[in-house]
Swiss-Prot record:
Keyword Membrane: no
Name listed for the protein in its UniProt record: Histone deacetylase clr6
PANTHER family named in the record: HISTONE DEACETYLASE HDAC1, HISTONE DEACETYLASE HDAC1-RELATED
Any one Gene Ontology cellular component term annotated for this protein: Rpd3S complex
Reaction equation(s) it catalyzes: N(6)-acetyl-L-lysyl-[histone] + H2O = L-lysyl-[histone] + acetate
One Pfam short name: Hist_deacetyl
GO biological process annotation, one example: transcription initiation-coupled chromatin remodeling
Alphabetical keyword list: Chromatin regulator, Hydrolase, Nucleus, Repressor, Transcription, Transcription regulation
Gene: clr6
Chain spans, region Histone deacetylase: 6-318
Length: 405
C-alpha cells in the first residue's frame, strides 16, 4: 500500500449520525459517526484538514435535480406525509427511500460535503478530499432511488468541471452507479466507470454494452461482475480497466465512490472482498496523483463499514494504522477480535478467469474507440456553481478532542 503524504481535507458534520431511515431499514447514517470516532481515536484528525461542510441549499441541489423534487424534499415530513401522498408516488419516496425526520437536512449535509470537497480541489487547498456521508449514487434528476435522494456525486462533478476539463467517476459499490451514469450519459466531459454485480440484482442496469450515447458514446464504462468475486479476481479487472481509462481519457480529476457493500459478509452484498482488496482500489487510484474525491455509498454491516473507511482515511492521509482498534465509543461493535480488518470468507467465486478476461478485453476495445483526450473547446463548461454563504468552517482541534475517549 502506498502511504505517501498528501494534503487531505476531510468533511464531517457531527449531526449526520442523528438521522434514522427507520428501525428496520438497512441504511444507517450512524456508521459515519462510527468512522469519525475511530478517526479521532487513532489521532488521524491531526493529519487531516477537518471541515464542517456548508450545507447545500435548494439552489445548490437544483443544479442537478428538478425544482419540484427538491421543493418536495424540503417540505415533506413524517407529519405531512399523507398530504404529500401523490408526490411520494411521483418522486419514488416510500419504502426504500422513506420520509424521516430531518430528511432534507440529511441530504443537505451529504450534498454539501461533496460540493465542498470539489471546491477544496478547485482551490488547490487539498489534493484529496473525503466525504464519507456522500456517495449516494442512485438518486435521479427527479426521483429518489435505492436509499438515495440527492446525487451529491453529480453535484461534485459539476463543480469540478468548472476548473477541470475531464472528470473520471469510479464506483466500487456492489450496486451499479446508475444515477451518476444517467446524469452524464451524453457527455464526453465526465467518464463513469462502475464495477458491480449484474443480473437479478438492484438496480438491474449496467450492462457491458451500455456505453453512452451521442457525444457520450464510449464514455460510460460498465464492468458487470458475478457473485463471490474475491480480491485477486477484482484486482485482475480493476487495474487494467482503470489503467486504460487513465491512458485514453486522461482525466484531470477523479471521484471514487467507495461503497463497502462489496465487502465479504455485507448484509445486502454478494461479493467477497476483504479490506485489503477494497482498499487496493483506493490505493491504485491514489497512485495516479490526480486531484481526488473519495465518497461513501453502500455498506450495511456497519462495523465493517467503519473499519474500512477508517483504514482508507489513513491510507489517503499517508498513515498506517495499528491493527488493534483504539478504545472508542463503539468498541462493543467490533468484538470479538477488536481488529482493524475485514477478511474474505469461503464464498464460491462465480467469476471464471475466462469470463473476467472476456469482459476486460471488450471494455479495453471500447476504450480504444475514444478520440484521444477529448477536446473540451467543443463543449461549454458549466457556469459558476457556488454555495450560498459558502464559508467553510474548520473544526477547532479542541472541539475534535471532545470526541476522544
Amino acid at each position: 500500500m502506498g502511504f505517501g503524504k498528501k494534503k487531505v481535507s476531510y468533511f464531517y458534520d457531527e449531526d449526520v449520525g442523528n438521522y434514522h431511515y427507520g428501525p428496520q431499514h438497512p441504511m444507517k447514517p450512524h456508521r459515519v459517526r462510527m468512522v469519525h470516532n475511530l478517526v479521532v481515536n487513532y489521532n488521524l484528525y491531526e493529519k487531516l484538514n477537518v471541515i464542517t461542510p456548508v450545507r447545500a441549499t435548494r439552489n445548490d441541489m437544483t443544479r442537478c435535480h428538478t425544482d419540484e423534487y427538491i421543493e418536495f424534499l424540503w417540505r415533506v415530513t413524517p407529519d405531512t406525509m399523507e398530504k404529500f401522498q401523490p408526490h411520494q408516488l411521483k418522486f419514488n419516496v416510500g419504502d426504500d427511500c422513506p420520509v424521516f425526520d430531518g430528511l432534507y437536512e440529511f441530504c443537505s449535509i451529504s450534498a454539501g460535503g461533496s460540493i465542498g470537497a470539489a471546491q477544496e480541489l478547485n482551490s488547490g487547498n487539498a489534493e484529496i478530499a473525503i466525504n464519507w456521508a456522500g456517495g449516494l449514487h442512485h438518486a435521479k434528476k427527479r426521483e429518489a432511488s435505492g436509499f438515495c435522494y440527492v446525487n451529491d456525486i453529480a453535484l461534485a462533478a459539476l463543480e469540478l468541471l468548472k476548473y477541470h476539463q475531464r472528470v473520471l467517476y469510479i464506483d466500487i459499490d456492489v450496486h451499479h452507479g446508475d444515477g451518476v451514469e444517467e446524469f452524464f450519459y451524453t457527455t464526453d466531459r465526465v467518464m463513469t466507470c462502475s464495477f458491480h454485480k449484474f443480473g437479478e440484482y438492484f438496480p438491474g442496469t449496467g450492462h457491458i454494452k451500455d456505453t453512452g450515447i451521442g457525444t457520450g458514446k464510449n464514455y460510460a464504462v460498465n464492468v458487470p461482475l458475478r457473485d463471490g468475486i474475491d480480491d485477486e479476481s477484482y484486482e485482475s479487472v480493476f487495474k487494467p480497466v482503470i489503467s486504460h481509462i487513465m491512458q485514453w481519457f486522461r482525466p484531470e480529476a477523479v471521484i471514487l465512490q467507495c461503497g463497502t457493500d462489496s465487502l465479504a459478509g455485507d448484509r445486502l452484498g454478494c461479493f467477497n472482498l476483504s479490506m485489503k482488496g477494497h482498499s487496493m482500489c483506493v490505493d491504485f487510484v491514489k497512485s495516479f496523483n490526480l486531484p481526488m474525491i473519495c465518497v461513501g455509498g453502500g455498506g450495511y454491516t456497519v462495523r465493517n463499514v467503519a473499519r474500512v473507511w477508517t483504514y482508507e482515511t489513513g491510507l489517503l492521509a499517508g498513515e498506517e494504522l495499528d491493527e488493534n482498534l483504539p478504545y472508542n465509543d463503539y468498541l462493543q461493535y467490533y468484538g470479538p477480535d477488536y481488529k482493524l480488518n475485514v477478511l474474505s470468507n469461503n464464498m464460491e467465486n462465480h467469476n471464471t478467469r475466462q469470463y473476467l478476461d472476456s469482459i476486460t478485453s471488450e471494455i479495453i476495445e471500447n476504450l480504444r474507440n475514444l478520440s484521444f483526450a477529448p477536446s473540451v473547446q467543443m463543449h461549454k463548461t458549466p457556469g459558476d456553481f457556488t454555495f450560498e454563504n459558502a464559508e467553510k468552517q474548520n473544526i477547532a482541534k479542541e472541539e475534535i478532542m471532545d470526541e476522544r475517549v
